[in-house]
């Protein structure tokens, strides 16, 4: 899948690279975007000192980090309009106003609508990538695949379902490396506590 990803970066359409919490997304970003301009959305930590440290280390490969707020979304849209790569961690739990419930491994999960909205506003191609840890700490294997076709649907429900199916497919390649502690189901459609 890397070939198709790199081919897509040569067009002026922009590329959305989904990087679920599997293995190490920073390794994925450094590897795939080493010589490609890219902008990555991230959730800033509450402590400025920690934020500065994290941003500095993640930016050393020329990766632009932008926060998950209005400014960040605007930066991401601008990057796509310039034909650049945008990295998004699609399994982050959004605020209620930034998501809709969609099945994730058979359970309703609050799913970000951002990717679906970006796809409708730009001609960007969507890929999903992971950097799987190899046994005995010998390194990582980068795997990149095109997102499920349904992600391009103008129907939000279909697009969100395809987004979650894309994430599920990646998780199933290395279940033990997914960050299950992330509590993807912490917000429920009926307000009850899942955890």
Question: Where are these predicted regions, by residue range?
Answer:
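Short Gly/charged-rich anion-binding patches and loops
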Residues: 3, 27, 53, 114-117, ...
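Catalytic core of membrane glycerolipid acyltransferases/transacylases, capturing the structured
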Residues: 13-70, 82, 96-103, 107, ...
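Non-catalytic C-terminal accessory region of glycerolipid acyltransferases
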Residues: 9-11, 34-37, 71-195
